[in-house]
């Protein structure tokens, strides 16, 4: 289903296209430019593939440099995941088109923010993926403090004209739930701050209806409601938007 655009203010110029086949048709041409978006789903649902595809397409299709911020995966793991779909991240890193930074979970939010801002300026970054976002607040239990810290980070990214995707897992069986690391305090904070919420589902039973994506929130966007089936092919995610 192709959605009808509402006005010129939602034109392509105000969008950051993901380049994921079929997905951008669900949300008026892509993510709202300079927005903060969360991609949620269980293990194996397609979150990491979506992030890598977003960054790869940013460079190869739209000439936008990207930053992958990780707290778990090593560079080599990311290269191996990407090359399965024909995406040569190692070459893009060598060419300075994509940067990968791996932080320790003990790194302070302030140090993370400073390093991100430095990379953005030095490498003309336009797209950022953070995986997983729960690590940013895992040591905090006070909701107001979590909101303050995440607000400072996301505000800085918006100020620097960055379109950001945060990724994390939903609990087992939590089809419509939003949970980061199983902690509802952090969940509410991130849910409040994000402009877009995108859920990936996988039943694990196989077949045409095994996987679906659902945009549950996207500000300033007349997005498709309800789950839409997708496949993970040898070239990445393909959404059935018809």
Give residue ranges: language-model regions.
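Pre-Walker A adenine-sensing motif
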Residues: 18-30
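Conserved P-loop
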Residues: 33-38, 42-110
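Mobile, glycine- and charge-enriched loop segments
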Residues: 77-106, 116, 121-123, 137, ...
